């Protein structure tokens, strides 16, 4: 018997972090919700990260996903921008980990290849394929569409690729260890 799995995809960014929630039952995907969490660019970095943390925590608490997928950071010529993206990505990894949820990470080109069939697909192609795969999806910003694409990628690869458990606290040690152990046990079923 196949059960529904709620998958939260996160596209990290300091200005806008996209999120998308789908349900996967076997190979059948259903759209649940999506949006963006924003931070105020006029605030100091620490307060912007707090805004992202609070926003993602609300999403995780409200929608109670079973698994989370986050896009990996790519390095570009602007080291400062890459570092800021790294900060936002750390928040995107931390929030579900604190909630005891398993987190998978996917490279941007794998997301593009999975969703559009081309590892170098343009954003418009990704959005069109997300809309094709999830006809009820309503997204106003590319960040939300990208997050849905990340969730779709996880749904496609979760059975073939073991979740990276290096970030999980060993059962019996550290805060949230019982929740993490329970989440990992659910994956092993």
Curated annotation (Swiss-Prot):
Active site per database record: 11, 71, 143
Keyword vocabulary terms for this entry: Cytoplasm, DNA damage, DNA recombination, DNA repair, DNA-binding, Endonuclease, Hydrolase, Magnesium, Metal-binding, Nuclease
Cofactor(s) needed by this chain: Mg(2+)
Enzyme class, UniProt record, top EC level: hydrolase
Matches recorded under HAMAP family: RuvC
PANTHER family: CROSSOVER JUNCTION ENDODEOXYRIBONUCLEASE RUVC
Family, similarity comment: Belongs to the RuvC family.
Record-given protein name: Crossover junction endodeoxyribonuclease RuvC
Source species: Methylorubrum extorquens (strain PA1) (Methylobacterium extorquens)
